[in-house]
């Protein structure tokens, strides 16, 4: 009987040795002693709760959560265990779970002001996070990007000005593009795309310019991309053809073939009917453009030596002599 009576007294002394004050003094030593105690008494809810406190002081919040969960399984109405569970969840940045845990503990003990304090902390952080998300969403909506393709590349342009190269991170994988940009205003812009077709990551690059960020993704094959993004099985891609070269889909509802536009402009210039000096100048330009090296040398030499009064294409003539100044009959040449 004497031995039986000594058991509870010994257990009480052991429990007293694990008070919060003693744990504060040396949490690591207390952790080791509590682990030994739990080996002897694996169903002691209070030991788990106190060991969780050791984990909190040592910054091991996940281990703390595991211990308080075990403590609450053995004693669901342990307010201290709920408080410590919420603290661990808070430090693990699981603010929603922490808020729920603190609210549960407050229902059990409304006089403990610790629950009020931690509930307010969670609410402040959650409200702050919502504000940050709203600011980020505003940034995302302001910044636009365009894309176009050539036979060998798909090019994305981010319309972001005055960004330093060190503030830009771009990642390439076979079917994914990610970009993170630190905006001068202090907000971040992120872009993540699941690409329609594969790219060659190691041959893909980006360039930071004063007015934009240009991302060039290398195509493994000269195929035409019908769109930028896509998932799953895609139809057999079409081979890239000249009639779609350098089309800029952009954010507009139409595409423009810039090569075709340049060709049309050149054709208009070629067929433009000029009169007077303009027609004569165009004729000289055409002669010079189509001429041989000797013709070009003759035109340059005659024009320079004559002060612009003679233009000859006969190199065998002007190459042997200095071309004299010869103004038109009704004009007089003067040197200024």
Swiss-Prot record:
Placement of covalent cross-link Glycyl lysine isopeptide (Lys-Gly) (interchain with G-Cter in SUMO1): 266
Modified residues (N-acetylalanine): 2
Residue location of crosslink Glycyl lysine isopeptide (Lys-Gly) (interchain with G-Cter in SUMO2): 266
A molecular-function term among this protein's GO annotations: protein-folding chaperone binding
Annotated positions of the Phosphothreonine modification: 236, 255
Main localization of the protein described in the UniProt heading: cytoplasm
Any one Gene Ontology BP term: kinetochore assembly
Cystine pairs: none
Swiss-Prot/TrEMBL TPR repeat ranges: 11-44, 45-78, 79-112
Keyword annotations: Acetylation, Cytoplasm, Isopeptide bond, Nucleus, Phosphoprotein, Repeat, TPR repeat, Ubl conjugation, Ubl conjugation pathway
Annotated Pfam families: CS (PF04969), SGS (PF05002), TPR_17 (PF13431)
Residue intervals of the CS domain: 140-229
GO CC terms in record: cytoplasm; cytosol; kinetochore; nuclear body; protein-containing complex
UniProt modified residues of type Phosphoserine: 252, 302
Domain of life: Eukaryota
InterPro entries: CS_dom (IPR007052), HSP20-like_chaperone (IPR008978), SGS_dom (IPR007699), Sgt1-like (IPR044563), TPR-like_helical_dom_sf (IPR011990), TPR_rpt (IPR019734)
Post-translational modification: Phosphorylated at Ser-252 and Ser-302, dephosphorylation promotes nuclear translocation, most likely due to disruption of the SUGT1-HSP90 complex.
Chain segments annotated as transmembrane: none
Record domain SGS: where: 247-336
PANTHER family hit by this protein: PROTEIN SGT1 HOMOLOG
UniProt subunit comment: Probably associates with SCF (SKP1-CUL1-F-box protein) complex through interaction with SKP1. Interacts with S100A6. Interacts with HSP90.
Family note: Belongs to the SGT1 family.
Function: May play a role in ubiquitination and subsequent proteasomal degradation of target proteins.
Swiss-Prot/TrEMBL domain comment: The CS domain mediates interaction with HSP90.
The name this protein goes by in its record: Protein SGT1 homolog
Record organism: Mus musculus
Gene: Sugt1
């Amino acid at each position: 009987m004497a031995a039986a009576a000594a058991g509870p007294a010994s257990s009480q002394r052991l429990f007293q040795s694990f008070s919060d004050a003693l744990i504060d003094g040396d949490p690591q030593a207390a952790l080791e002693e509590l682990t030994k105690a739990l080996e002897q008494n694996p169903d002691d809810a209070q030991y788990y709760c106190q060991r969780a406190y050791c984990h909190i002081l040592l910054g091991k919040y996940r281990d703390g959560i595991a211990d308080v969960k075990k403590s609450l399984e053995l004693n669901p109405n342990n307010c201290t265990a709920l408080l410590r569970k919420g603290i661990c969840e808070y430090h693990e940045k699981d603010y929603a779970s922490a808020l729920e845990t603190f609210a549960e503990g407050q229902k059990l003990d409304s006089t403990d002001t610790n629950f009020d304090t931690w509930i307010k902390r969670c609410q402040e952080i959650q409200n702050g996070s919502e504000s940050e998300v709203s600011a980020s969403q505003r940034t995302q909506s302001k910044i636009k990007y365009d894309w176009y393709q050539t036979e060998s590349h798909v090019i994305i342009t981010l319309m972001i000005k005055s960004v330093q190269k060190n503030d830009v991170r771009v990642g390439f994988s076979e079917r994914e593009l990610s970009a993170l940009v630190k905006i001068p205003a202090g907000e971040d812009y992120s872009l993540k795309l699941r690409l329609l077709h594969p790219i060659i990551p190691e041959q893909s690059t980006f360039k930071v310019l004063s007015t934009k960020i240009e991302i060039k993704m290398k195509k493994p094959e000269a195929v035409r991309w019908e769109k930028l993004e896509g998932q799953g099985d895609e139809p057999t891609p079409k081979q890239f053809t000249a009639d779609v070269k350098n089309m800029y889909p952009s954010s507009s509802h139409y595409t423009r073939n810039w090569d075709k536009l340049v060709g049309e402009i050149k054709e208009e210039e070629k067929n433009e009917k000029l009169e007077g000096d303009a027609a004569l100048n165009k004729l000289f330009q055409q002669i010079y453009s189509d001429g041989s090296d000797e013709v070009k040398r003759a035109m340059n030499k005659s024009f320079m030596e004559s002060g612009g009064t003679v233009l000859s294409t006969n190199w065998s003539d002007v190459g042997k002599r200095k071309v004299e100044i010869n103004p038109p009959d009704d004009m007089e040449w003067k040197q200024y």
